[in-house]
Amino acid sequence: MAATDVRPKITMACQVCKHRNYITRKNRRNDPDRLELRKFCPNCRTHTEHRETR
């Protein structure tokens, strides 16, 4: 039942160090593609590109 959830939980991973730093929810109807945001990475200690992982 969770596989067809409209707002699933996703994990955001840093593209530089590959650490999974954030867990958030997204709406699949509005954003069917992978989410990409610039967020702070505590491991890199800078703002980097974070991408949705599955």
UniProtKB/Swiss-Prot annotation:
Which superkingdom heads the taxonomic lineage of this protein's source?
Bacteria
Keywords attached to this Swiss-Prot or TrEMBL record, sorted alphabetically, are: Ribonucleoprotein, Ribosomal protein
Q: Name one GO biological process term.
A: translation
This chain's source organism reads: Parafrankia sp. (strain EAN1pec)
From the Swiss-Prot or TrEMBL record, give the protein name. Answer: Large ribosomal subunit protein bL33
Query: Source gene?
Result: rpmG
Q: Which family does it belong to?
A: Belongs to the bacterial ribosomal protein bL33 family.
What's a Gene Ontology MF term here?
structural constituent of ribosome
Gene Ontology CC terms? cytoplasm; ribonucleoprotein complex; ribosome
**HAMAP family for this protein:** Ribosomal_bL33
Against InterPro entries, the record matches this protein to: Ribosomal_bL33, Ribosomal_bL33_CS, Ribosomal_bL33_sf, Ribosomal_zn-bd
Q: Which PROSITE patterns match?
A: RIBOSOMAL_L33
